[in-house]
Amino acid sequence: KRYFTANGKFRTGLLSRIVKDLEEIGAKDIEWENKPEQIEPFIPSVGNFKYREYQERAIYNCLKRKRAIVDSPTGSGKTLIMAGCIAALQWGDNPTGVVLFREKGILKQTYEFFKKCGIKDLGYNSGEGYVPGKIMLSTVQSIERIIDTHLKESEILMVDEAHQFCKGDTTIAAIESFPNASYRLAFTATPPREGAKDINARMVLEGAFGSVYTTRTAEDLIKDGALAKPIIQVVDNTPVSSVASDLTYLDIYDQYVVNCDVRNDKIKDIVSKVYRSNPNAKILILVKNLQHIENLQERISNCYTIEGKDDIDSRYDIINKFVKDNKAATIIGTNVMQTGISIDE
């Protein structure tokens, strides 16, 4: 696939890649018309939060470069980096900007965090509500509501969980819009790989946001003490000797995972063991469907559940009760728990 037109036009985020290619073939005296002025960034503090060194460096580079796909691992504080960038751009100014999300839950969580950071004139737009503001947090599904106020006016475009925006007509159209956004920043823990067989996802993101900037790896942050070192235990579950040939994958999953008493009892025993060893333990269990939630809830004491039918406020109310429970507790959720949800415990 070609990423430039017959007359040489290309997405501006690909400029650094194209310049590099030109240099590799010996091109010299490359001229760059209308090159943006380089301004030394000022980074103000936000709320009561203190930046780690790599977070402050990431904010500096985002502001200096104006475009970046920020590659930062889960737990590294991407949302604080986002808030720091916006706070810096609001210093002595009142810019218009949009932060796009795919998930309402992450939007709500980010909105509350940005308020704690002191982000000014903050707005909110999703299927569950609308609050006007110059810095508008919006789901891509509800973007039509802010077209008139933010499409041409926005000087800032940010995208959270950016790997979710490199496929699909609606999401790609969204990140390729906002023509006057001179600051274009995308944040993800899993950017599409450079050497992937399907390079299109990477090129779509780079075209809209520029090259990848890596903060620190998860391994680095574990060594620094910023992230806890995970302990992974693989629990043996003796496989069945044979499976009927006429069963579909879903039939097999229901029979040998969701409704398997031996397997579910083993999960119950593990939870009970943790409860006995730590009277304040907090356990998270992720499953794929509602029936599995019910099967485990019947077995596990002091158990909270989150399902897709729960609205955003209900989900956070349940999480808050779970975190503040003064006894050992378990929370079981489906895929609504699997992206970007922050649980302090």
Name each region found by the language model.
Residues 108, 120-132, 282-286, 294-295, ...:
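Conserved helicase ATPase core of P-loop NTP-dependent helicases/translocases
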Residues 79, 143-149, 225, 319-324, ...:
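SF2 helicase motor core recognition
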Residues 85-86, 242-288, 294-295:
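Conserved interdomain hinge at the start of the Helicase C-terminal
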Residues 64-70, 95, 279-281, 328-329:
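Pre-Walker A (Motif I) flank of P-loop NTPase domains
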Residues 126-156, 166-174:
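Conserved helix/coil segment N-terminal to the catalytic DExD/H
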Residues 163-233:
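Post-DEXD/H (motif II) to motif III coupling segment of the RecA-like Helicase ATP-binding lobe
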Residues 76-116, 193, 288-293:
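Conserved Walker A/P-loop ATP-binding site and its immediately adjacent core
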